[in-house]
Amino acid sequence: PKYDALVVAGPDSTFSDRDKLLLDQYLMNGGNLLWLIDPLATDLDSLRNAQQTLATTRETGLFDLLFHHGARLNRDLVLDAQCAPIVLNAGPMGNQRNMQMFSWYFAPVVLAGPEAHPICANLDPVHFDFVSSIDPVNDIAGRKSQVLLESSTRSILYNAPVRVASAVVNLPPEHFETNRIQGHPLAVLLEGRFESFYAARLNAQLRDDPDFAFRESTPSGRMIVMADADFIRNDTRPVEGGIAPLPLGWDRASQRVIYDNKEWLLNAISYLLDDAAQISLRSRSIAFRPLDDTRIRGQESSWIMMAIGSPVLLVLGFGLLLSALRKRRWTQN
C-alpha cells in the first residue's frame, strides 16, 4: 500500500460497506492499522450545562469488522478508582465558590506493569476519558493477541446506556472493591495472520475480478485497537481570538503535563512501522543509584576531615619538596 500505517481516530458517523472493504483490503495488502474508536457517544456540552448526560451507542459500522479481526468493542464505560482528579464546585462557601478536587472515575489512569510490551515499557501513566472495554476474540492459527493497557483491579463496568453525572464523585471507595485479579482490557494488539472480512461476503464476479485484486488473507499484519478516541486528543484553553491546544497528556488539575499519552502514541506508531530503534530510544530508562545513607552518616567525620585536611597536606608536602630541592641545589653549588 501507499501508506505503511493508517490511524482511524474517533469516527462519528457510520462507515459504508465500500469504506470498510477498503480498510479490510488495506490490511490484507500489508497495511497496519491503529483504531481509536468510541463505542459510546457522550455529550460533554450536556454534562457541563446540566451536570449530567446519557452515553449511548455510537453506530460506526465497525463493530463487526473489528470483531472478525479479533477485537470486540464492548458497549460500556469503565469506571476506575485509579483515576484522574477533577475540580468541581462543592457548594457555596459564603460569597465564593467552593472549588475542591475530586476523583473523576470516568477518567482511568493506567500504568503498565514491569513485564509490559515495548510500546508501554518505561512510560509514565497514561490517561483515558470515557473509555470502553475490549475483549480479544476469534483467535486463529498464526495470529496472536496481547492486552497492552488495562484498568486497575478496582474498576467496574456500566453497560449502555450509561448515565454520566458529576455526582459520580460521591461514590464511596467501597463501591470499587471487587475480587478481580485483572483489570478490564483497554487497548489490544493483534498481529500475525488476518483473513478478510469480505472473503465470504463479496459476489464471485467482484472477488475474482483481476482489476480489483481482492486478497483473502495476509500472513503478517498488525492492528492496535483502543476504545477511546480522546486518548490522542489535545485539550484546549481559551486565548484572545479563539482557542489554543495544550500539550497531549496535560492535566488540568495540576496545570502541567503528567501523562505519557504522546509517548505511548509515538511508540504505537513506531511498532506498527516496525521501527524498534525509535521505541528503544524513547523508552530508555536511566538507573539512579542512590547513596547509602547509613554509610554516609557513619563515615561523615572521616570524609569531612579528608575534604579539609587533604588540600592542607598537599600544600605542605609541595612546600617541603620545593624546600628540599632548593637546599640540595645550593649544597651542590
What is the predicted role of each segment?
Residues 266-299:
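Juxtamembrane amphipathic/hinge helix adjacent to a transmembrane helix
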